Regions:
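N-terminal beta1-alpha1-beta2 module of alpha/beta enzyme domains
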Residues: 1-86, 209-212, 436-437
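An alpha-helical appendage that flanks or caps ligand/catalytic pockets
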Residues: 2-17, 146-209, 242-245, 249, ...
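Hydrophobic or amphipathic alpha-helical targeting/insertion segments
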Residues: 86-87, 91-137, 143-146, 151-155
Length: 437
């Protein structure tokens, strides 16, 4: 792996930033998840800071106990297409589930976004952890964890094949001869698999990036295997430097099985940060935002990870209850981590719920403190980059204005974009067309 590494940075649209109740903060845009002016402001701020991309999460099921900004938010591809017309170099990464969509449509949508943005599209691949999603797609039941990842693996094979339908110079458009395309540079997929039968070809040209960037969000064994085979980047979260280093080594070591080098997959840690005038100011900001979360809301938030389990039935100030293997078919890696930390630290249900609903930011303090933390994790091979979430509604602008210049001054982060595409920003080579001889 090359040691001439450059830190990569993205940010995530996550309501008003901060915790689930941050919309109540005096400085918050209460309708941030559905306010395009706010979304535009955030994207332009990210681009001014030369960040690699903006990331839009998504979900396919809500109920009355869902996180407030999940109840009312933009569909990712739609809002990213709008941002494509406003931004010029910022990458545009959107979430779409392989469990409740079709490969042909997905390939076409992200290829269109890549053309609209002139090469800045990214797809965050998820398999949908919530059982309720099935109810919105005329399905009798939600696929189990292992099956979802088998479907995702074949789905990605199909999508990548469709993206390779056309060679780069297939469209001749010769007005004199009347030749619109070179038929020798058109390739039909004709896929027949366990889950999908897709003929192809795709009805849009090969994209500026060859293929849009593929992100994968998931830290289970199945998720890591899927990323090692197909992804350009992985979005993950570990609580400690040691855990992040172990994850980093594990994922990178799996790439060789697919004839890939460690540099071909970037690992992004999702981190919350707070930038303050000093440590006391940063702590005050955290406590102000944390105080907005009620224990009732925290229990609902915790329950979402465990298939919307009702935690209100248990005593709050006794040890976290034994709930068996609940969560294995939803957010498996997250629920395993929650149960492990509760057991190892002897936490009560109240403590677990409040920590989950308003987690303490990973990097907090002055701008220099935050930059130090990011630098340590990067240089110690715990991450290739970070997806930044503001720990309060006021944080992200300060991160761009104060932390990014420090990272640039230290030679860790570039001062300008290296090109116009997300692939160029991430330092990833153009993929070969699998059908081209």
């Amino acid at each position: 792996m090359s040691e001439n590494r450059q830190l990569r940075l993205g940010t995530i649209l996550h309501g008003a930033s901060g915790n689930m109740s941050a919309w109540r903060h005096p400085a918050a845009q209460a309708d941030a998840s559905i306010n395009f002016a706010f979304v535009t402001q955030t994207a332009l701020k990210a681009e001014a800071g030369k960040l690699d991309f903006i990331f839009v999460a998504d979900g396919l099921y809500i109920n009355e106990k869902s996180i407030p900004h999940f109840l009312n938010r933009f569909e990712p591809l739609t809002v990213l297409s709008a941002l494509a017309a406003i931004t010029r170099q910022l990458g545009l990464v959107g979430t779409l589930s392989t469990s409740y969509s079709e490969p042909f449509t997905t390939a076409r949508q992200f290829a269109s976004l890549d053309h609209l943005s002139q090469g800045r599209a990214g797809w965050n691949v998820v398999t949908s952890p919530l059982e309720g999603s099935a109810k919105n797609f005329s399905r009798a039941q939600h696929p189990d964890h292992a099956l979802r990842y088998r479907i995702a693996d074949e789905y990605l094979q199909v999508v990548k094949g469709l993206w390779d339908s056309w060679e780069e110079d297939a469209f001749v458009r010769n007005k004199e001869t009347g030749q619109f395309f070179d038929k020798n540079k058109l390739h039909t997929l004709d896929h027949h698999g366990d889950f999908f039968k897709v003929a192809g070809p795709l009805n849009i040209a090969r994209t500026p990036q060859g293929r849009p960037i593929i992100f994968q969000a998931g830290a289970s064994d199945d998720g890591k295997k899927l990323a090692a085979r197909h992804a350009d980047a992985i979005f993950t979260h570990q609580d400690s430097l040691a855990e992040a280093q172990a994850f980093y080594r594990d994922v990178k070591s799996q790439l060789a099985a697919y004839q890939r080098s460690p540099d071909q997959l970037h690992i992004f840690q999702g981190v919350s940060v707070i930038v303050g005038d000093d440590a006391e100011d940063a702590e005050r900001q955290y406590q102000t935002t944390a105080a907005l979360v009620s224990i009732e809301d925290a229990l609902n938030y915790l329950g979402r990870y465990f298939e919307h389990h009702d935690f209100s039935q248990y005593p709050l100030d006794e040890p976290f209850p034994d709930i068996g293997d609940l969560g294995q078919n939803s957010f498996r890696s997250t629920t395993d981590e929650i149960k492990r930390h509760a057991r190892e630290r002897g936490l009560t249900l109240r403590q677990v719920a409040l920590e989950a609903a308003s987690p303490r930011p990973r990097f907090t303090g002055t701008a220099s403190d935050v930059a130090d933390g990011l630098q340590l994790w990067f240089e110690q091979h715990a991450a290739d980059g970070f997806i930044i979430q503001g720990g309060t509604p006021e944080t992200f602008p300060r991160f761009v204005d104060e932390v990014v210049p420090l990272l640039q001054a230290r030679g860790l982060f570039r001062r300008d974009y290296p090109g116009t595409t997300l692939r160029e920003s991430l330092g990833l080579a153009l993929p070969a067309n699998q059908f081209q001889k």
